[in-house]
């Protein structure tokens, strides 16, 4: 759900980084935050759990542009990867506009990747969303490590029909992080433009987006 602020003529689209525990979701956001000029991003807020983290911050890339007269801001979230935080994951997914699924390329992580992707589909269905109708890209992370799955193996497991864009990455050193962000931003903004051009009535006004509870 896109949030509109008519006072500042800004709107915010929500992008969620999803995937199994320790796959690199948090690392992606730290790299983006650290390499983006302070004038082009908001403050990063970390809602920590005992074994994992959920992160959130506003981001205003220079090249997002203006849509329908609104300056567009992207809100980037991660979700906790541990199974017992599934309720939190569903809360974070509410109102999502685009998803980056971060897969861990290490060979022993094949089944956890598949299970996490199934979990994504199930959680979206529970909140009335269809994964096939949302902008979604895959990031195959940790390509710099040994004993990793091939891209073909990852696609066979997560992208068998080849319909999803995917990006190879090594988030720990920044490789592929911004390419992934650019990919999901492009799809999300394209969907947003299409949605706005098809709506005849004025959208609901929200003063500001709320940070999800852990």
Predicted regions and their residues:
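Inter-motif core of Ras-like GTPase G domains
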Residues: 85-108
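Amphipathic helical hotspot of TIR/SEFIR-family domains
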Residues: 108-130
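Conserved nucleotide-binding/hydrolysis micro-motifs of P-loop NTPases
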Residues: 22, 82-83, 106-108, 142-146, ...
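Conserved G1/Walker A P-loop phosphate-binding module
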Residues: 2-49
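Conserved beta-strand/loop subsegment of P-loop NTPase cores
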Residues: 98-101, 125-142, 160-168
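Canonical P-loop GTPase G-domain recognition
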Residues: 137, 144-197
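Switch I (G2) and immediately adjacent beta-strands of P-loop GTPase domains
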Residues: 44-84
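Low-complexity, Pro/Ser/Thr/Gly/Ala-rich intrinsically disordered linkers and tails that serve as
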Residues: 202-214
